[in-house]
UniProtKB/Swiss-Prot annotation:
Gene for this chain: HBB3
Positions of the Globin domain: 2-135
Name of the featured protein: Hemoglobin subunit beta-3
GO process annotations (BP): hydrogen peroxide catabolic process
Native organism: Somniosus microcephalus (Greenland sleeper shark)
Similarity comment: family membership: Belongs to the globin family.
Molecular functions per Gene Ontology: haptoglobin binding; heme binding; metal ion binding; organic acid binding; oxygen binding; oxygen carrier activity; peroxidase activity
Length: 135
């Protein structure tokens, strides 16, 4: 994936202006409400963003996003350790959608179309890398 300097700067804006843990936990909470079948993998979750199990999983998602952010030019090789987990890759896309909604809610007017496009590109790269690793 080719990144322009502007796209990288826009992804950095999102990364630097958000509380990663809170945004991801809220996105997970939204995921479990909007797409309840995704809870199949998380039988111990009550689905609320403040729940300790959701917070713990949000931390794992934040770690994966941080890894991708730190290696934005070459994400896929850094996700090799996820191989063999056998999770439905579509769930990553659904979470990415919920994350976009949460970012829009959090950043309000700062979540411009340009910012949204750059973040969407980033999340698509992450989803693609995870999907290949989990198959």
């Amino acid at each position: 994936v080719h990144w322009t300097a502007e796209e990288k700067a826009l992804v950095n804006v999102v990364w630097s202006k958000t509380d990663h843990q809170a945004v991801v936990a809220n996105a997970l909470g939204r995921l479990f409400v909007v797409y309840p079948w995704t809870k199949t993998y998380f039988t111990k979750f009550n689905g609320k963003a403040g729940d300790s199990t959701v917070q713990t999983h949000a931390g794992k998602v934040v770690s994966a996003l941080t890894l991708a952010y730190n290696h934005i030019d070459d994400v896929k090789p850094h996700f090799k350790h996820y191989e063999g987990f056998h999770v439905d890759p579509e769930n990553f896309r659904l979470l990415a959608n919920c994350l976009n909604v949460e970012l829009g809610h959090t950043l309000h007017k700062e979540f411009t179309p340009e910012l949204h496009a750059a973040w969407n590109k980033f999340s698509n790269v992450v989803v693609d890398a995870l999907s290949k690793a989990y198959q």
